[in-house]
């Protein structure tokens, strides 16, 4: 069994110090992989949108977030669990002048310093085109994963890969990414020569590979599709979970929603945990797993 407790850290500014508020949401079971107990801490973010500094007064979650506070929280968590993994589900770019002037260099440098393990790509990562994105990601010290963007023949080839396997002690954690359909979100010239692939088929192929052939104890999808099913037939994490197997956790993004421990049954009737932490870096998600 994979036992998961999920929390949110809401990063708030007080007069004298930053206070980290953890909200316990619930405790449930996901997956069905028998093994002796191991513990894993997963910290995750999404849709930071270049919010390097705390949010301004007058905005929702004013004075929350900011890279310095995030870095402090991550360091605090690493003292509790040095083996934690740190993930991002995309759209770390666009939204403040930091991105307008530096095109993502500030964000990637900060994520290197924070020790991210893997990220996937959001639509705003392409706002200055594939070549600019590739130049920025050349300096990344973390894996960039996306299983449904074919990057063959582009400057992202060799930088973006379908999945990665993170090792922590005896644990093997498979992490793969899914990008949103760029149509209507990304200018064609900024996405070319990449090809968008169907997310469900791509996800199932990679999940089967990770679980069955690569013998991963846990399979995590970093998805930039949006969490909830919708009447427009647009791909979502909820639909993905229902239509696949061998995925244990989907960490979502794109729709800027607070998704608090949503469990969806997959094709085999096993529970898949869906999470998303809103936007602008006001919160960090924390998942504690026993396998």
Stretch-by-stretch model annotation:
Residues 9-21:
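Bacterial N-terminal signal peptides that target proteins for export
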Residues 32-291:
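Acidic, metal/ion-coordinating pockets
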Residues 1-11:
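N-terminal amphipathic/basic-hydrophobic helices that include classical n-h-c signal peptides
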Residues 5, 20, 24-25:
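Leucine-biased recognition of intrinsically disordered, low-complexity hydrophobic segments
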Residues 24-33:
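Hydrophobic h-region of N-terminal signal peptides that target proteins for export
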């Amino acid at each position: 069994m994979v036992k998961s407790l999920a929390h949110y850290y809401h990063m708030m500014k007080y007069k004298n110090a930053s206070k980290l508020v953890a909200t316990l949401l619930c405790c449930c079971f996901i997956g069905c992989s028998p093994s002796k107990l191991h513990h894993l801490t997963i910290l995750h973010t999404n849709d930071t949108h270049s919010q390097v500094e705390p949010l301004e007064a007058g905005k929702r979650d004013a004075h929350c977030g900011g890279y310095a506070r995030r870095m402090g929280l991550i360091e605090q968590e690493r003292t509790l669990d040095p083996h934690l993994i740190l993930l991002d589900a995309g759209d770390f770019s666009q939204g403040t002048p930091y991105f307008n002037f530096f095109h993502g260099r500030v964000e990637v440098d900060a994520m290197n310093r924070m020790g991210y393990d893997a990220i996937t790509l959001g639509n705003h990562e392409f706002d200055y085109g594939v070549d600019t994105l590739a130049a920025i990601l050349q300096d990344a010290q973390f894996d960039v994963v996306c299983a449904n963007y074919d990057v063959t023949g582009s400057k992202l080839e060799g930088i973006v890969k379908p999945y990665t396997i993170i090792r922590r002690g005896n644990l093997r954690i498979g992490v793969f990414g899914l990008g949103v359909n760029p149509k209507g979100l990304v200018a064609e010239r900024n996405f070319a020569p990449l090809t968008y692939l169907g997310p469900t088929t791509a996800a199932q192929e990679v999940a089967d590979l990770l679980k069955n052939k690569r013998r991963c104890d846990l399979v995590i999808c970093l998805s930039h599709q949006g969490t909830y099913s919708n009447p427009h037939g647009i791909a979502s994490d909820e639909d993905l979970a229902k239509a696949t197997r061998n995925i244990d956790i989907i960490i979502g993004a794109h729709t800027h929603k607070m998704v608090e421990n949503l469990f969806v049954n997959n094709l085999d009737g096993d529970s898949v945990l869906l999470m998303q932490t809103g936007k602008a870096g006001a919160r960090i998600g924390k998942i504690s797993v026993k396998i």
